[in-house]
Regions:
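N-terminal, intrinsically disordered low-complexity tails/presequences enriched in Lys/Ser/Pro
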Residues: 1-4, 11
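Catalytic glycan-binding domains that act on GlcNAc-containing polysaccharides
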Residues: 8, 16-158
Length: 158
């Protein structure tokens, strides 16, 4: 079976994805499910749920079909924009053999939370864990600020 990679195919896929997400958000189904999955990951890894919600908000805008192709050619997928290629050992551990599996909200939040947890263990604080989640480049402090601003918003709503 040939791989569909034409521009028209990607545009159609994004359009269908947008319609599906819009329907889920309108019905309240999507966000309720995300809240439950975030609560589960928060309890499992000891990550404040506001941090997980903030990362999801900044990374994907709560779109479980979010996709991003990076400058290095790797791809981020799903709610937490998990990068398959940069996390091969975790992919193996979770039995993920196809990057498309990362569109599953439960699996994506589980793996994303695990990455964030490992970063926290490595650096000992949430600010550096968040920075490392996006990459340790010196120029990604804007990302950290965006996430922390969202954390404040979510704290007010909980």
């Amino acid at each position: 079976m040939p791989l569909k990679t034409t521009r028209a195919w990607h545009i159609q896929r994004e359009r269908e994805s947008f319609e599906k997400v819009l329907e889920e958000v309108s019905s309240g189904k999507n966000t309720t499910n995300i809240h439950a999955l975030v609560e589960k990951a928060s309890l499992k890894y000891g990550i404040p749920k506001e941090i997980l919600m903030a990362i999801i908000s900044v990374e994907s805008g709560f779109n479980p079909r979010a996709y991003n192709k990076n400058k290095d050619g790797t791809e981020d997928r799903g709610l937490m924009q998990v990068n398959y290629q940069h996390n091969l050992s975790l992919m193996k551990e979770y039995g993920i053999t196809d990057p498309e599996q990362l569109y599953d909200p439960e699996l994506n939040i589980e793996v994303g939370a695990r990455i964030l947890y490992e970063n926290y263990k490595r650096f000992g604080n949430w600010v550096m864990a968040i920075k490392a989640y996006n990459g340790l480049k010196a120029d990604n402090w804007d990302y950290v600020r965006k996430v922390l601003n969202k954390v404040s918003e979510f704290r007010r709503s909980y």
